[in-house]
Amino acid sequence: QKKDKKD
């Protein structure tokens, strides 16, 4: 499971 972190 890959979580994309968007700032």
Swiss-Prot record:
Subcellular locations according to the entry: Secreted
Coiled coil regions, renumbered to chain: none
Keywords in alphabetical order: Pyrrolidone carboxylic acid, Secreted
Main localization (coarse): secreted
This protein's GO CC annotations: extracellular region
Signal peptide, first to last residue: none
Tissue expression summary: Expressed by the venom gland.
Residues with the Pyrrolidone carboxylic acid modification: Q1
Membership in a protein family: Belongs to the tachykinin family.
Name of the protein in its database record: Tachykinin-like peptide-I
Source organism of this protein record: Phoneutria nigriventer (Brazilian armed spider)
